[in-house]
């Protein structure tokens, strides 16, 4: 127990909760897909969102969103994950990075190419 004088000198540190704990303070993490499937979003929206269950090198098993139209990710694919939730999918707090490791970039993508790992099209 600190004294009142110690608390005046330096206040207690607030515990900061991270939004992506599985990354363990790293910008990205590598992982292996254990299951690739589609799921439906929350109430006002309707779609089949592509997600994957990923076992990370940090030991966590998380659900990650596969962005873009079409993908080549299957079970045992090695993928790179970044933080970032999907608002209408509960429990999905990570995104798979397209165009790295086993995740190919989106085909025929002309705009926002860097977000989807697409190469510059030939003129």
Curated annotation (Swiss-Prot):
Any coiled-coil regions, as ranges: none
Transcription recorded as keyword: no
Ribosomal protein found in the keyword field: yes
A GO molecular-function descriptor: rRNA binding
Basic residues compositional bias, start-end: 107-123
Disulfide bonds listed in the record: none
Ranges where the record places region Disordered: 103-123
Keywords for the protein's UniProt record, in alphabetical order: Chloroplast, Plastid, Ribonucleoprotein, Ribosomal protein, RNA-binding, rRNA-binding
Pfam families on file: Ribosom_S12_S23 (PF00164)
Main location: plastid
Annotated Gene Ontology cellular component terms: chloroplast; small ribosomal subunit
Record-level GO BP terms: translation
Compartment annotation: Plastid, Chloroplast
Subunit note: Part of the 30S ribosomal subunit.
Stated family: Belongs to the universal ribosomal protein uS12 family.
NCBIfam families documented for this protein: rpsL_bact (TIGR00981)
Function per UniProt: With S4 and S5 plays an important role in translational accuracy. Located at the interface of the 30S and 50S subunits.
Record-given protein name: Small ribosomal subunit protein uS12c
Gene: rps12
């Amino acid at each position: 127990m600190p004294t009142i004088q110690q608390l005046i000198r330096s206040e207690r540190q607030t515990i900061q909760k991270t939004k992506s704990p599985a990354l363990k303070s790293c910008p990205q993490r590598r992982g292996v897909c254990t299951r690739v499937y589609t799921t439906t979003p929350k109430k006002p929206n309707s779609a089949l969102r592509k997600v994957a269950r990923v076992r990370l090198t940090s030991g966590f098993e998380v659900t990650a969103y596969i962005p873009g139209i079409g993908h080549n990710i299957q079970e045992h694919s090695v993928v790179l994950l970044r933080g970032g939730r999907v608002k209408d999918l509960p429990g999905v707090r990570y995104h798979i990075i397209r165009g790295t490791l086993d995740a190919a970039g989106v085909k025929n993508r002309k705009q926002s190419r860097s977000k989807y790992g697409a190469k510059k099209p030939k003129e």
